């Protein structure tokens, strides 16, 4: 999800004809997905199964949002460089953003959204969740203004800069718990939970889709109740890498605005959270 900032920049004020919803999808939080060696990347034995399960959960969220009066639902495929969803698979009334190299100017245009939903979301690195990580399995911790965040918090902070709230999340139980620390009123659906070191207990796909559709419907109907999560400015982001991630760290240090403050720690600073992420993601 390294390019997530580019897909949340285009947030704005409420639409007149009905809420416009932006869905961030990922795969590690989908029900039934628990094996990084078999289910997460193209060519792996069960990857096609994971794609099918992801599409089902995403489409359930789309259906629920539309039933509640959403005028537009745009999905960003946030897994594996936007290669996990196909336009053949998504709800016919949804739109799909794909491609990690999409020009940033496209997302800095006039597209406006009223709420963000997460589908298939995992918890931050270090959390006791299913396949928990932050951007990559090389990152140990990420802090925004001293607060630990994962991908959920990063999206929430960027959206908050544009006064857009997170309204719903589906994923594993740890991800649901995480979003509620930032948005206590968010609708959540825990489609699975960790029951061992790597084993999970998941809802059936049919039940997961039903609960996601209901939650998305409720979230859109309640959209006026949600407040964005805002960071004080200026903003500092600190990234701590695991030992052995020297190659990733070296690549990060090629970014002109970074500062290495400890052997495994890099800091970025900016006037806004968006500026900080542009420093991080722009080589």
Locate predicted features.
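Mature N-terminal segment immediately following signal peptide/propeptide cleavage
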Residues: 17-35
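C-terminal accessory domains and tails appended to enzymatic cores
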Residues: 73, 208-283
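Sec-dependent N-terminal signal peptides
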Residues: 3-13
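Alpha/propeptide regions of enzymes that mature by internal proteolysis
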Residues: 41-76, 82, 93, 215-222, ...
């Amino acid at each position: 999800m390294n390019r997530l900032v580019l897909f949340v920049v285009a947030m704005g004020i409420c639409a007149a004809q009905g809420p416009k919803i932006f869905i961030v999808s990922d795969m590690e939080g989908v029900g039934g997905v628990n094996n990084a060696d078999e289910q997460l990347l193209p060519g792996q034995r069960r990857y096609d199964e994971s794609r099918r399960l992801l599409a089902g959960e995403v489409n359930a969220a789309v259906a629920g949002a539309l039933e509640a009066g959403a005028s537009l639902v745009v999905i960003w495929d946030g897994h594996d460089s936007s290669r996990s969803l196909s336009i053949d698979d998504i709800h016919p009334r949804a739109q799909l953003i794909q491609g990690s190299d999409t020009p940033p100017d496209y997302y800095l245009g006039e597209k406006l959204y009223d709420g963000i939903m997460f589908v298939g979301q995992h918890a931050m690195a270090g959390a006791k969740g299913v396949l928990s990580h932050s951007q990559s399995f090389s990152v140990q911790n990420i802090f925004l203004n001293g607060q630990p965040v994962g991908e959920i918090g990063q999206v929430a902070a960027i959206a908050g800069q544009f006064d857009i709230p997170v309204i719903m999340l589906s994923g594993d139980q740890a991800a649901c718990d995480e979003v509620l620390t930032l948005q206590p009123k968010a609708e959540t659906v825990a489609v699975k939970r960790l029951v061992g070191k790597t084993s999970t207990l998941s809802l059936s796909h049919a039940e997961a889709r039903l609960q996601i559709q209901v939650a998305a419907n409720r979230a859109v109907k309640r959209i006026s109740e949600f407040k964005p999560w805002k960071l004080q400015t200026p903003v500092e982001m600190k990234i701590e890498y695991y030992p052995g991630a020297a190659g990733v760290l070296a690549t990060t240090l090629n970014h002109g605005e970074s500062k290495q403050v400890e052997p495994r720690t890099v800091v970025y600073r900016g006037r806004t959270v968006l500026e900080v992420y542009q420093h991080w993601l722009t080589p």
